[in-house]
Amino acid sequence: LYSDFYELHDSPRLGTYLRIYRRICDGDATEYDLSTCLRDLSRMLELHYGKKVVILIDEYDNTMNAAYGNPEEHQKIVDFMRTFLSTALKGNHSLRFAVVTGVMKISKECIFSGLNNLEVNDVLSDQYDEMYGFTQAEVEKLLIDNDQPDRISEAKEWYDGYRFGSVDVYNPWSIINYVKRGCKLDVYWANTSSNSIIEE
């Protein structure tokens, strides 16, 4: 993650954070450096750009789910993630806001116990239901704008399958690839994460 922000490597605005940045990029980070690296990176970005940071964390629970069958490894990951997330998301003055997604329901116990002001929205919540994918109107406009209005029902049959709150939405990745490839029907979304913890 740090290597994606190479502009920080010689930033005159980082002060003592420059040493942390270089330790992480050089592979010399301590466990503490790693557990606080997201908070520290957000601070570095604010110092460099002069703006608060938005943190987006997708599949926050992926490594925990993968280690579910190994209690010792699972606990190590839970302990690390508790520090990693709480330092990044609580009391971080460089943070504007954060969005965290995952398979497991976010609970104020466990790894999020250190956080307050936590707003949890799940697939049944109406508040952001239209923001989890493309709506019917958006897909129709996209297809019409790409001279493919006759493909609307086909796209609905293949890629409309999610319901958040009270709205049916399309998988954006699938729709983008479908349109980009000349409306060629295919399974564009590959499930790369494990949901074994839910299956149990």
Task: Please annotate each region the language model reported.
Residues 1-200:
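Phosphate-binding site recognition
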